[in-house]
Every structure is written in structure tokens, then in C-alpha cells.
């Protein structure tokens, strides 16, 4: 049966498939607070977010989703394919601005010989070389390949800031100062991670 390894905040240098996902994140740690499995990245992100909060600003974020155990052939070609269906659902999450599958944007900078996944004989069924290391594409042509399906969901910075901004006051048709009160999250990603996971299920 397919398993959802989870969705976590990520920094691109260490994909989720290369991290230990066998246990829950320890409560009260930076890793738990930020939904980040990479201990080094969690420390760096924590420092960055404290700085952003002091500056009364916000920052964009990326949530990584990893789905394991999909058999070959799940999905449909064209509009009902695995990637279009997931992208449509994930883009409905407030603040989502872009979706990447597998190599994502990086694939646009590659040659076909670099990006193509090679099929090889497997124990039960054919498998893509690189499936175990996370280098193979989890979906091709709208259908699953049997390899892990890696999805990156990019979120914009939260727009409500505790610093002064300007907006148009419609009745007067003039720019006016706007300062939003209350509590402000400087980033969407940590709270969006469980939402990304729920949408993918």
C-alpha cells in the first residue's frame, strides 16, 4: 500500500528521502516546531525566522512531500494524470504559488540525457534506476513509475505584516498607511506541511 512519508519544510541541499523518517519529531525541538527533519536546516531556519520576525517582515517557504510505495501505473494520461491532479489540489492551499515534481525547475536546465530515467529489470516488476536513491521520477506521463514521488510546494511570504505598508483606500481613492495588528507568522511552511500531507491523501 502507498505510504505518505510526510511533508516537511525543506532546504534543497538535503531532500527528505535522504533523511531519517522512521520516527516522530521530538516535541519542543526546533525540528518539531518547524516541521523539518534536517537538524542542521532546522537550526538555520530558526535563526533566519527570528531575524525576519525582529525585522517585522515575512519570508517565502517550500514544503517537500514524499509518497512511497505507489505501484506502477496509478493515474491517467493528460488532464487526470497523477501530477495534474496533485498540482490542482495542492495549488488550492492558500498561499501556494508553485509546484515542482522530481527535478522540477532544475529539469529545464538539464539535457535529456541527464534527466531521462532508465528502466531496469526489478525483482517483481521493472524499476527505474535511481528509484532507491530518490533520483528517479515518481510519475511520468500522468502515471506512477513505482519510484518515490517527490513534490515541492512553494508558498509566498505571508502578506499580513506588523510593519507599516501602504494600500489604496477606495472611498477616497488615495494611498493610506496600513499596519495590521495581532499575531503574525513570518512563514507559511511549518503550518502548511500537515495541510500538504492531508491534501495528498
Predicted regions and their residues:
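Single conserved hydrophobic/aromatic residue that forms the stacking wall/gate
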Residues: 1-6
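Catalytic-loop motifs flanking and including active-site residues across diverse enzymes
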Residues: 7, 86, 144-147, 194-196, ...
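Long, well-ordered alpha-helical segments
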Residues: 7-15, 157-164, 201
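Glycine-rich, mobile lid/loop segments that gate access to catalytic sites or pores
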Residues: 7-78
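Short, mixed-charge aromatic SLiMs
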Residues: 15-24, 112-115, 173-178
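Glycine-rich anion/phosphate-binding loop at the beta-strand->alpha-helix junction
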Residues: 45, 55-175
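Internal helix-turn-beta structural module
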Residues: 160-201
Amino acid at each position: 500500500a502507498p505510504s505518505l512519508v510526510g511533508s516537511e519544510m525543506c532546504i534543497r541541499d538535503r531532500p527528505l528521502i535522504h533523511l531519517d523518517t522512521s520516527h516522530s519529531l521530538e516535541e519542543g525541538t526546533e525540528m518539531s516546531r518547524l516541521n523539518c527533519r534536517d537538524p542542521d536546516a532546522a537550526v538555520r531556519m530558526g535563526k533566519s525566522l527570528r531575524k525576519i520576525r525582529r525585522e517585522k517582515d515575512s519570508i517565502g517557504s517550500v514544503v517537500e512531500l514524499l509518497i512511497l510505495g505507489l505501484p506502477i501505473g496509478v493515474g491517467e494520461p493528460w488532464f487526470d494524470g497523477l501530477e495534474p491532479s496533485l498540482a490542482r489540489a495542492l495549488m488550492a492551499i492558500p498561499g501556494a504559488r508553485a509546484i515542482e515534481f522530481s527535478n522540477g525547475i532544475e529539469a529545464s536546465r538539464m539535457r535529456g540525457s541527464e534527466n531521462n530515467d532508465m528502466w531496469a529489470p526489478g525483482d517483481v516488476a521493472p524499476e527505474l534506476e535511481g528509484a532507491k536513491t530518490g533520483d528517479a521520477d515518481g510519475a511520468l506521463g500522468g502515471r506512477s513509475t513505482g519510484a518515490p514521488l517527490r513534490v515541492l510546494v512553494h508558498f509566498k511570504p505571508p502578506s499580513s505584516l506588523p510593519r507599516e505598508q501602504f494600500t489604496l483606500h477606495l472611498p477616497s481613492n488615495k494611498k493610506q498607511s496600513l499596519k495590521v495588528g495581532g499575531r503574525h507568522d513570518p512563514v507559511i511552511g511549518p503550518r502548511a506541511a500537515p495541510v500538504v500531507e492531508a491534501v495528498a491523501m
